[in-house]
Curated annotation (Swiss-Prot):
<keyword id="KW-0812">Transmembrane</keyword>
<protein>
    <recommendedName>
        <fullName>NADH-ubiquinone oxidoreductase chain 2</fullName>
        <ecNumber>7.1.1.2</ecNumber>
    </recommendedName>
</protein>
<feature type="transmembrane region" description="Helical">
    <location>
        <begin position="200"/>
        <end position="220"/>
    </location>
</feature>
<dbReference type="Pfam" id="PF00361">
    <property type="entry name" value="Proton_antipo_M"/>
</dbReference>
<feature type="transmembrane region" description="Helical">
    <location>
        <begin position="3"/>
        <end position="23"/>
    </location>
</feature>
<feature type="transmembrane region" description="Helical">
    <location>
        <begin position="122"/>
        <end position="142"/>
    </location>
</feature>
<keyword id="KW-0679">Respiratory chain</keyword>
<keyword id="KW-0496">Mitochondrion</keyword>
<dbReference type="InterPro" id="IPR003917">
    <property type="entry name" value="NADH_UbQ_OxRdtase_chain2"/>
</dbReference>
<keyword id="KW-1133">Transmembrane helix</keyword>
<dbReference type="InterPro" id="IPR010933">
    <property type="entry name" value="NADH_DH_su2_C"/>
</dbReference>
<keyword id="KW-0520">NAD</keyword>
<keyword id="KW-1278">Translocase</keyword>
<dbReference type="GO" id="GO:0032981">
    <property type="term" value="P:mitochondrial respiratory chain complex I assembly"/>
</dbReference>
<feature type="transmembrane region" description="Helical">
    <location>
        <begin position="178"/>
        <end position="198"/>
    </location>
</feature>
<dbReference type="GO" id="GO:0005743">
    <property type="term" value="C:mitochondrial inner membrane"/>
</dbReference>
<keyword id="KW-0813">Transport</keyword>
Amino acid sequence: MKPPILITIMLTVVSGTMIVLTSSHWLTVWIGFEMNMLAIIPILMKKSNPRAIEASTKYLLTQATASMILMMGVAIDLLYSGQWTMSKTLCPMASAMMTIALAMKLGLAPFHFWVPEVTQGIHMSSGLILLTWQKIAPLSILYQISPTINPNLLLPMAIASVLIGGWGGLNQTQLRKILAYSSIAHMGWMAAITLYNPTMMILNLTIYIIMTSTTFMLFMYNSSTTTLSLSQTWNKAPLITSLILMLMLSLGGLPPLSGFIPKWMIIQELTKNEMIIVPTLLAMTALLNLYFYMRLTYTTTLTMFPSTNNMMMKWKFNNTKKMTLLSPLIVVSTMLLPITPLLSILD
C-alpha cells in the first residue's frame, strides 16, 4: 500500500473514533462507527491473500450487524424519548439492544467468535490496531450509557468473556490467537467494572492498550507468529526473550507488574459494592489466562530447540530506531505498580 493512501486511511480511522468520542448525538455516533469500520477494512487486507480477505469479510459482517442493532436501539429510544441526543434515561429495551450491539463490536462472549478468526487471518500490525484502537470507540459509548445498563445482562457476558478468554487460549500455538483470547478476557474485566466505576474502566483500557501494543511490537520485531518461532528467540536476541517473559507475566496480572493494577482495583471496587461472587469468579478464571501466559514464558525461556546458529548472540540491536518507542512502553508495561496509591482519585 502506497504511503499517501495508507496515511489517508489511517486518518479516517482516527477521525471515525474521534467523532464517536466527541459526539452527543446518536446519528453522528453511527457515522463515526461507519467511517471507522469502512476505513479499517483496507488495513486488514493489507496483505492480500485469501485468509486476509476472509477475515475482513467476517469483520465487516459482524460490525455491520452490530451497527444495525445499535441503530434499532437508537430508534426505540427515539420513540421513547423523542430526542436523538444521548441521555442517562434510556428505556430498558433500547439499553439492552445497545449493550448487545456494543458487546458484538468489542467481542464479548457470546459474540466473541469473530475475534480469534479475524486476528489470525490478518498481519500482525493490523492485529495490533484491531485489538487496541478499535476497542476505544465502543467502550466510550458503553461508558456513556453505563447508568442505564442492566447488570443482569452485562455481568454474565463479562464473566463468560473472562472464562472463554482463558479456556480458548489454553490449546493455542498461534500468537495472534493467544492475544485475541487475551483481548476477550480483558474486555470481560472492563465490562464488569463499567457498571460500578466507569472511570476505572478507562484505566484498565489504558494499561491494556500499552501492554498489548508492546507485546505486538516485540513479536513483529522478532518476526514471531507461533510458539515454536518464539522459542527460538533466545538464539537471536536474548534481551527480547527477557522482555517477552516480563510482558507475558504482566498481561497475566502477576504482581508486582503493571498488569496486576487493574485486576487488583477492579476486585477491590466490586467488593466495595458488596459483590462477592463476581470478583471471586473473575479471580478464579483469571488463573486460566495466567496459565497460558506462564506456558508461553516457559516455551520462550526454559526450552531451547536444537540450533545450528554459530553466530554471536545479539546483545545489541542493529537498528535502534525501531526500539525507540519500545523502551518507554516496556517500562510502563511492567513497572507501574508503585504509583497505585496515586490512583485513589478514581474512588
